[in-house]
Structures are given as C-alpha cells and as structure tokens.
Amino acid sequence: MVSIRPDEISSILKQQITDYDQSVSVSNVGTVLQIGDGIARIYGLDQVMAGELLEFEDGTEGIALNLEDDNVGAVLMGEALGVQEGSNVKSTGKIASVPVGEAMKGRVVNPLGQPIDGKGEIPTSDNRLIEEMAPGIIKRRSVHEPMQTGITSIDAMIPVGRGQRELIIGDRQTGKTAIAIDTIINQKGQDVVCVYVAIGQKSASVANVVEVLREKGALDYTVVVSAGASEAAALQYLAPYTGAAIAEHFMYQGKATLVIYDDLTKQAQAYRQMSLLLRRPPGREAYPGDVFYCHSRLLERAAKLSDDMGGGSMTALPIIETQAGDVSAYIPTNVISITDGQIFLSADLFNSGLRPAINVGISVSRVGGAAQTKAIKKIAGTLKLELAQFDELAAFSQFASDLDEATQQQLERGKRLRELLKQAQFSPLNLAEQVAVVYAGVKGLIDEVPVEDVTKFAAELREYLKLNKAEFIEEILKEKKLNEGLETTLTEVIKEVKSSMLATV
C-alpha cells in the first residue's frame, strides 16, 4: 500500500489555489428555431446587438438584423448546409471586419476579405470594420483635384474630381462597366489605389475584368471584391461596404483611391430579398423603407479629406442599371439624389455606333467643374452646349426640308464633334491628346474634313504629336494649361495633319 505523504498533498493544494483562475467566461448562446432561404430565426440570444456577427455550429457566420421580443432574425453568410433546427448559435461580440493594407493590392477577395483567386492567404495583420462612420464636415474639403478618366467626352464635358461621387447609369449592355474599367486603367502611374466591387455578376464576367486589368498592368494597384450571382444575398449586400472599408484604409493614409460599385441595383435587390424574408414591411417597388439609407451611408464615405486629415480622397463611381431608360424608378432616383452628378448612357446612341454612348443632354457633374484642368476647361466650355443643341437640331432637321446656312453649318460641325469623341474601349487618352482633339473640333479647324474621315484624322493627329511634338505633350501634362504659344503650335500641327490627309483622300 502506497503511503500518503501529507506535505506532498498540501503542496499540490497550495499550487492549485495559486493557479486558480477566478475569471468567468460567459457566452451568449441561442438555438435555431427555423432556417431557410438564407435566414435563421434564433431563440435565446438575449444580449445580442444589431449587426453583430453570429457563429453557427458548423462554422458558418451570420449577422443579427432583426431583434424581436422572442427571437432574433439573422442572415447567413454562406450555404450553411450543416445548420438545422435545434443547432446552437453563439454571439461573438464583434461586428464584421475585413483585412486591409498593401497586401490586398492585386488580389481578388470575397466580401469577408477571404481570397478567392487561388494565390493563398493575404499576409496582412491590419483589419477594418466593414461599417464605418463617414467623415464629418470638418474633416472634409471641397473637391479640387481632377480624377482623369481618360475618356475625352467625360473629362471635357462631365469632369470628375477626386472625392466626388459620380453615378454611371444606363440600360444593360450600354458600356457602363467599360467606362469604369477604362477609368481604372487610366490611373496607371498616378499613385491611385483602385477597388472594383462586383455585385451579383456572373463569375465569367468578373474573371474577364480581372484578366483585362492584368493585361493592362492595372491589377497591381487594384483590389477586386466579388460577390457573384450564386452567392448568398447577405454577401451581395455586404460587398460594397467591404470595398469602401478597403479604400478607406488608404484614404486615411493620405492616398487617392477610386471605388467602383458594379452595380448597386443588384445590392438593393439583395437587400430587398433579405428584408422581405425577415418580414420587414415593404414600401415602394417592395423595397424596405431604409433602402435609401443603405446607399446614402455607403456613398457618404467617399470624400476629399482636409489637409489636417492627410488630404486623402475616395472617389466613388456607383453603377445603376435602368429598365428601358427609366431613370424615374425608385433606386435610380435615390442614387441620383445622393451622388454629385450622373453619366447617362443611352441604348439608342450605343446601337447607333456612338461609343461611349453618353447622352450629353441629361448627364451632369455638379462639383467636377472646380476640379477640371485649365487646359481642357478653356477649350471645352462650349462643347457640351454645342453637342446638346446638335442633338435637338438633328431631331428637328428630319422634318425640315430647307435649313438656313447657319443651322446647316451647326449640324455639320456637330457631326464632326460627335465623331471626334468616339473612343475605343481600353484605350484611354492622356490630357494632351484630349486637348488636341477637342481643340481641333471646337475651333472649327476640321470643318473641311469629311465626316467619315474624322476618326482617322484624330488618330493621325495624336500619332503626329507623339512622334514630332513630344515637348508639346510634356508641357501640357506638366503645366496643365494651354498658353498662346502652345495654341499656335497646336493650330499649325492640326493644319499640317489636315492638309496631308486631305491630299491623300
């Protein structure tokens, strides 16, 4: 029989008393009452907060949205095949956050910040809450720097500034995404961090966008956030906020950022689906009453920060899809009222061969004018008015047989201006090229060039400047102004290119 040693027992007891941990861990646990359609009703989560992350038994995460007397309504961020009635749910005490930082550049992530591009984990320790308060009035300053899109018709007539929210709106297949991608490509070498958020899109479309960005060397400074059409509604709803959080990290470091939300119509539809399944009362077009707040709190996060805050900026280009050009529907009118202007793309113009198919008459930039460079502002002042008048005259002239000479001349110039503004996809132009092209049209220097040869003339003019007048391009890009000496040089170049071209026609 083993002898009991009192000193050994007492030392063990003393050790256990010393190591005794008095802290009590309390976890708030509930039970799933009902589950289906990406929604779970949970009993027992008494201490949960609105918007809090929940963890289900199988590891699936959810967000508590409806806090009712006897149950909690939560949306699931995943398929949750292992969750069933009676499963346990634990509240985490946290709000959804995503990894941020330099390591995110060049990566494709889901709305939870998890990589989906097959390149392994993202080596970053920085995190940021998906939902953040927008900067207040004192932290902002007015928009004053240009955000060059590389698309002549936008930079000349509907200029966008850093920190602006400019809506791109139009029917399906009118080139909305093309404008956004061109803008990202044009930021190469500008030290701008871009975030492209794809909401409810086909996986093939997103893969195509990523491939184009990679080919053009734009993926190095771009983060792609994708919530595909097959993803849960909760993830499609969260995706834009994730994109904003990733861009905010760079904005508060004093950098310029550009975020594209493609598109917010799908996000609103995902939010409507969630709200109806949570039995929230429907409003106009069955959208919930707070769908305006859903978009306004997102787009208000775009700002140009004051110098005290580092001077960073977040420019937002939200995209909205209309049905048969109806901009008076609920979501389009909401987003138009939140943003600082809109670029309206017309299906009729697109089908007639005008690319980008921008309807100049109803497109507007409410704050971008202050940010426009002096060079383009000087020559493009009358361009928008001339094109808008041309559209009206062209419609009127179909019914009139004899037009006076001034009207005839205005129509002829309008045709040439429209041809000049045609631009191929994925080929953004720099400021000097835009100035040269617009100057030629506005000053009437190409009135003798046949309409069908105007596009060819514009290409030859740009080529001539690159080969023979590199110093002209350099000075415009550096000074961003068009002085008398440069105007004289440009006029001579245009006349020379025109005469050599007309000689061969």
UniProtKB/Swiss-Prot annotation:
Gene Ontology annotations for the cellular component aspect, listed alphabetically: plasma membrane-derived thylakoid membrane; proton-transporting ATP synthase complex
Localization in the cell: Cellular thylakoid membrane
Annotated site residues (Required for activity) in this chain: S363
Binding sites annotated in the UniProt record for ATP: G170, D171, R172, Q173, T174, G175, K176, T177
CDD domains membership: ATP-synt_F1_alpha_C (cd18113), ATP-synt_F1_alpha_N (cd18116), F1-ATPase_alpha_CD (cd01132)
Topology class, membrane: Peripheral membrane protein
InterPro entries found in the cross-reference section: ATP_synth_asu-like_sf (IPR023366), ATP_synth_asu_C (IPR000793), ATP_synth_asu_C_sf (IPR038376), ATP_synth_F1_a_nt-bd_dom (IPR033732), ATP_synth_F1_asu (IPR005294), ATPase_a/bsu_AS (IPR020003), ATPase_F1/V1/A1_a/bsu_N (IPR004100), ATPase_F1/V1/A1_a/bsu_N_sf (IPR036121)
GO molecular function: ADP binding; ATP binding; proton-transporting ATP synthase activity, rotational mechanism
Catalytic activity from the UniProt record: ATP + H2O + 4 H(+)(in) = ADP + phosphate + 5 H(+)(out)
Assigned EC number: 7.1.2.2
Pfam families in the record: ATP-synt_ab (PF00006), ATP-synt_ab_C (PF00306), ATP-synt_ab_N (PF02874)
Record keywords, A-Z: ATP synthesis, ATP-binding, CF(1), Hydrogen ion transport, Ion transport, Membrane, Nucleotide-binding, Thylakoid, Translocase, Transport
Source taxon at top rank: Bacteria
The family this protein is said to belong to: Belongs to the ATPase alpha/beta chains family.
Function noted in UniProt: Produces ATP from ADP in the presence of a proton gradient across the membrane. The alpha chain is a regulatory subunit.
Subunit details: F-type ATPases have 2 components, CF(1) - the catalytic core - and CF(0) - the membrane proton channel. CF(1) has five subunits: alpha(3), beta(3), gamma(1), delta(1), epsilon(1). CF(0) has four main subunits: a(1), b(1), b'(1) and c(9-12).
The protein's name: ATP synthase subunit alpha
